[in-house]
Amino acid sequence: MAPLRVERAPGGSQLAVTSAQRPAALRLPPLLLLLLLLLLGAVSTSPESLNQSHPTEDSLLSKGKMEDYETNVLPCWYYYKTSMDSVKDWCNWTLISRYYSNLRYCLEYEADKFGLGFPNPLAESIILEAHLIHFANCSLVQPTFSDPPEDVLLAMIIAPICLIPFLVTLVVWRSKDGDAQA
């Protein structure tokens, strides 16, 4: 190990310096240096390389499950599509709710049967496709409000107008009585 000398820094504090003229505080044990290099190597890897997953047995099984799930839910989609084609008004929920609920139930049941979560990407794409095909032109129908009959409207306008002078008179009359008592 190199001998240490103590020197003063320009500000007046003492620094321990090795014979190689390096501050002793910067010397690191080899194990700590190796750990630091490993950490820097892990941090400097690109995020793209971290996101790449190598196919494992589970991921291949999951891919097989998704393919089987897709083949099992296609009849659900075809049944829904043919049922919806027979409906005249696609925007009337009472007419289409049964078919839509059956599609959703079928997608969820098949996902559960294959051990997949619901909603999953395939189920979401089928539901989105259903919305794009059948409900794209549907909008929320808001009831249009009309004016009340004239006699009700006049009563609602005249009542506050007549009430205001009476209330002003009452306030003025009560405030005069209050001043006289004080």
Curated annotation (Swiss-Prot):
Q: What is this protein called?
A: Receptor activity-modifying protein 2
Task: List all topological domains (Extracellular).
Answer: 46-150
Single GO biological process annotation from the record: amylin receptor 2 signaling pathway
- What is the taxonomic lineage of the source species? Eukaryota, Metazoa, Chordata, Craniata, Vertebrata
What species does this protein belong to?
Rattus norvegicus (Rat)
Quick one: which gene encodes this?
Ramp2
Q: Which UniProt keywords apply?
A: Cell membrane, Disulfide bond, Glycoprotein, Membrane, Receptor, Signal, Transmembrane, Transmembrane helix, Transport
Q: From which residue to which does the signal peptide run? A: 1-45
Transmembrane regions: 151-172
Task: Note the topology in the membrane.
Answer: Single-pass type I membrane protein
